[in-house]
Amino acid sequence: MENNETSVDSKSIKNFEVKTIHGSKSMDSGIYLDSSYKMDYPEMGVCIIINNKNFHKSTGMTPRSGTDVDAAKLRETFMALKYEVRNKNDLTREEIVELMKNASKEDHSKRSSFVCVILSHGDEGVIFGTDGPIDLKKLTSYFRGDYCRSLIGKPKLFIIQACRGTELDCGIETDSGTEDDMTCQKIPVEADFLYAYSTAPGYYSWRNPKDGSWFIQSLCSMLKLYAHKLEFMHILTRVNRKVATEFESFSLDSTFHAKKQIPCIVSMLTKELYFYH
């Protein structure tokens, strides 16, 4: 007879098996039977916008002209969605860590979700404080289920406008042409996160000094149009298409001229997310 127990796919763990456990639902933790997140708490939640424009001379990094346009548009967009928006400018690594720690220690029990937007220089896996790099995973770890209990089972959205490497995308020409009746009380600590990156791993992310970044401006535009009627992943797909098809870099340096960009969405959300209820 075939063994129906589930096993761990890891070469470092041998002969280790775990049983599939069906538990009861937890109403206190924000985990519900519905297929969409509960978004009718008394508050939508906090939206922190970290806007790093000017960097210490020691880093050798240039000012991020146009980022204030992004920060202002984000504030307007998320305030319209009823979030408590907190704008923070030119933070060092230590200040960013403290900000994230303190935010994770707040009582989010009456809030539906959490949003953090980071506008800065970056590289793969890191973003820059004004004085140097910091691992993105370190910042997001403070909001894991085992550290931030009041956000368990609630969507935690991290929106990152930053480069993820130095590759350039030249583009390519194209041809024209039933509800579950049980919910487990125990959920993974990494569940219910979504990371919306402005670009794919390894690539540059583009920003216009006058109009702001392609990604953030497209995100705000699509949220304004569709936040009241579409699920968030569907909105992000439209953001991807807008950035991919409507933008192309212009530079007197041929190396950087006529380049493209595609945002990258990494979702560990366990339900559909609607900003309306």
Swiss-Prot record:
Regulation: Inhibited by BIRC6; following inhibition of BIRC6-caspase binding by DIABLO/SMAC, BIRC6 is subjected to caspase cleavage, leading to an increase in active caspases.
Keyword field: Acetylation, Apoptosis, Cytoplasm, Hydrolase, Phosphoprotein, Protease, S-nitrosylation, Thiol protease, Ubl conjugation, Zymogen
Gene Ontology terms: cellular component: cytoplasm; death-inducing signaling complex
Residue ranges the record marks as coiled coil: none
Positions carrying N-acetylmethionine: M1
Pfam families (UniProt xref): Peptidase_C14 (PF00656)
Residues annotated with N6-acetyllysine modification: K11
Propeptide feature: residues: 1-9, 10-28
Alphabetized InterPro entries for the sequence: Caspase-like_dom_sf (IPR029030), Caspase_cys_AS (IPR033139), Caspase_his_AS (IPR016129), Pept_C14 (IPR002398), Pept_C14_caspase (IPR011600), Pept_C14_p10 (IPR002138), Pept_C14_p20 (IPR001309), Pept_C14A (IPR015917)
Enzyme class at the top of the EC tree: hydrolase
Modified residues (Phosphoserine): S26
GO BP, sorted A to Z: apoptotic process; erythrocyte differentiation; keratinocyte differentiation; neuron differentiation; positive regulation of amyloid-beta formation; positive regulation of neuron apoptotic process; proteolysis; regulation of protein stability
GO molecular function, one term: cysteine-type endopeptidase activity
Key word ATP-binding present: no
Subcellular location: Cytoplasm
Reaction it catalyzes: Strict requirement for an Asp residue at positions P1 and P4. It has a preferred cleavage sequence of Asp-Xaa-Xaa-Asp-|- with a hydrophobic amino-acid residue at P2 and a hydrophilic amino-acid residue at P3, although Val or Ala are also accepted at this position
SUPFAM superfamilies noted in UniProt: Caspase-like
Record keyword Phosphoprotein present: yes
Superkingdom of origin: Eukaryota
EC number in record: 3.4.22.56
Oligomer and partners: Heterotetramer that consists of two anti-parallel arranged heterodimers, each one formed by a 17 kDa (p17) and a 12 kDa (p12) subunit. Interacts with BIRC6/bruce.
Described purpose of this protein according to its UniProt entry: Involved in the activation cascade of caspases responsible for apoptosis execution. At the onset of apoptosis, it proteolytically cleaves poly(ADP-ribose) polymerase PARP1 at a '216-Asp-|-Gly-217' bond. Cleaves and activates sterol regulatory element binding proteins (SREBPs) between the basic helix-loop-helix leucine zipper domain and the membrane attachment domain. Cleaves and activates caspase-6, -7 and -9 (CASP6, CASP7 and CASP9, respectively). Cleaves and inactivates interleukin-18 (IL18). Triggers cell adhesion in sympathetic neurons through RET cleavage.
Family classification: Belongs to the peptidase C14A family.
Protein name per the record: Caspase-3
Taxonomic lineage from the root: Eukaryota, Metazoa, Chordata, Craniata, Vertebrata
Gene that this sequence comes from: CASP3
